[in-house]
Amino acid sequence: EGHIVLNGDDDKLITVKEYEKIKPVFFGMSNECQVYGDKIVSRGLKGMTCTIHLGDTAFTVDIPMPGRHMVYNALAAAAVGNIYGLTTEQIKAGIESLEPISGRFRMIETDKFLIVDDCYNANPMSMKASLDVLQDGAGRRIAVLGDMGELGENEVQLHEEVGEHAGKCDIDVLICTGKLCRNMAERAQRTNPDLKVIYEPDRES
């Protein structure tokens, strides 16, 4: 017996049914999910604010990390907390006390610039999310992206997809380094000829 927590906004996952007394608990933006969020507001690089609904209960939470994807993470956490019997106050406190680990959406602020450090074990989804967040920053927005590893036979296509996404984002400069990132840089430039794209084959360059 138990539960499995799934993203109810995923067309494939939403089809999962109870199996061997394992009950699916869905989270997402649809009010048909057991745990859902709405009234989502971006606070720029400071984070996100949203209302989380747990059954007949709703509460507002300030997520201290930016990006719409962090709302999904908060909803998943709320679903797990609810399963384990935490109160809404405890769930809210846990989400609002979140601290990023090194390499995972960590903000490094200096007197001249702000670095969004999301370099640990990057993947296409995390890179696209980082680019989306970068758009909310003030001043010049510079993305420095490297090769993504362990992507298998689709590695070239996946780097191109990130490049296309970068080309559509409101950023000022894209710097790509690494052999696979050549595909990313070329696709970004084709997608947005006005974007300043710099490519270096290795970090030493």
Residue ranges and their predicted role:
Residues 1-115, 139, 164-167, 171-173, ...:
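Acidic, Mg2+-coordinating active-site environments of NTP-dependent enzymes
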Residues 10, 120-122, 150:
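Short, glycine/acidic-enriched loop or turn micro-motifs at the edges of active sites
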Residues 101-103, 120-129:
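Glycine-rich phosphate/pyrophosphate-binding beta-alpha loops
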Residues 128-131, 155-166:
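Charged helix-capping and loop-helix junction motifs
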Residues 133-142:
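Glycine-rich phosphate/diphosphate-binding loops that line cofactor/substrate pockets in enzymes
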Residues 177:
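Conserved residues at the C-terminal ends of beta-strands
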Residues 196-205:
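Short acidic-hydrophobic, aromatic-tinged amphipathic segments that line or gate anion-handling sites
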